[in-house]
């Protein structure tokens, strides 16, 4: 019997070490078992990486993190090259260990009290007009990090009064009342929380999360601020069916969600959940049509769509795929 991993505070656990801690064990995928990527999943990298390196340097200088880098997003080059990034607050170590996600797991250090000001100054220096703020899960904090979100929103608006802010929040498991009291008092311009996948696969895909809890979080924020768009996203290719995805879309509409993102799951490493299927662009278009027929005000559906991919265009209602 192998010895349990003793986690040291502030140490990042990734890949095999992270997967060893999940309740539903995942067998590492052998190379010959990997699904071959279809042509539509090929990414063309930009010829000039000057802007990309500039954003990375600004992040390092101010001790900030982007979910683009920490989660190995396939759109990093495109977004950084256009001068956009999704900032990840509350550190780069998550208290959850979802087997689809490349963000490190572990025992995080205390939040940086200066992060809101550093974040606000960086955003002002970059002259951003739309920003997405997300975070790792912080189950170690009494409010799940909600006050830190609020402090960041306040600091950003002080330095950039005309900016639009989208928050992509965790589920605040076990502390929804406390978190919503804080978040509804300092609301963003778009409130986003991802369901990620279908309820049948939740124990496998999102261990520690609850499908109905996440729906309730979205619903309760919408009840407090009916004028603010609520948004959620799902990955496809983890073993779900298109019919199950459409059923989740119905659940989201029933809970007041008005914006949707659907994108292809990509396996970060052989230790993560394997890709079960690649969904074609035509299928994404069909699901988008279903979403719009249900009453979503905007639906971004496509192989490379991620929750914050061209989030500014999504908020304006422009087509993203």
Swiss-Prot record:
Q: What class of enzyme is it?
A: transferase
Task: Quote the CDD domains the UniProt record gives.
Answer: Radical_SAM
Task: Specify the Radical SAM core domain's residue ranges.
Answer: 80-297
Record's subcellular location: Cytoplasm
Cofactor: binding comment: Binds 2 [4Fe-4S] clusters per subunit. One cluster is coordinated with 3 cysteines and an exchangeable S-adenosyl-L-methionine.
Which InterPro entries does the UniProt entry name for this protein?
A: Aldolase_TIM (IPR013785), Elp3/MiaA/NifB-like_rSAM (IPR006638), LIAS_N (IPR031691), Lipoyl_synth (IPR003698), rSAM (IPR007197)
Where does the UniProt entry say this protein principally localizes? Answer: cytoplasm
Does the keyword tRNA processing belong to this entry?
A: no
Q: Which cofactor does it need?
A: [4Fe-4S] cluster
Question: What pathway, per the record?
Answer: Protein modification; protein lipoylation via endogenous pathway; protein N(6)-(lipoyl)lysine from octanoyl-[acyl-carrier-protein]: step 2/2
Catalyzed reactions per annotation: [[Fe-S] cluster scaffold protein carrying a second [4Fe-4S](2+) cluster] + N(6)-octanoyl-L-lysyl-[protein] + 2 oxidized [2Fe-2S]-[ferredoxin] + 2 S-adenosyl-L-methionine + 4 H(+) = [[Fe-S] cluster scaffold protein] + N(6)-[(R)-dihydrolipoyl]-L-lysyl-[protein] + 4 Fe(3+) + 2 hydrogen sulfide + 2 5'-deoxyadenosine + 2 L-methionine + 2 reduced [2Fe-2S]-[ferredoxin]
A GO cellular component annotation here is: cytoplasm
Q: Which residues bind [4Fe-4S] cluster 1?
A: 68, 73, 79, 308
Keyword annotations of the record: 4Fe-4S, Cytoplasm, Iron, Iron-sulfur, Metal-binding, S-adenosyl-L-methionine, Transferase
The residues the record assigns to binding [4Fe-4S] cluster 2 are: 94, 98, 101
EC numbers listed for it are 2.8.1.8
MF annotations from Gene Ontology = 4 iron, 4 sulfur cluster binding; lipoate synthase activity; metal ion binding
Similarity annotation: Belongs to the radical SAM superfamily. Lipoyl synthase family.
Name the NCBIfam families on file: lipA (TIGR00510), PRK05481.1 (NF004019), PRK12928.1 (NF009544)
Protein name, as recorded: Lipoyl synthase
Q: What is the lineage of its organism?
A: Bacteria, Pseudomonadati, Pseudomonadota, Gammaproteobacteria, Enterobacterales
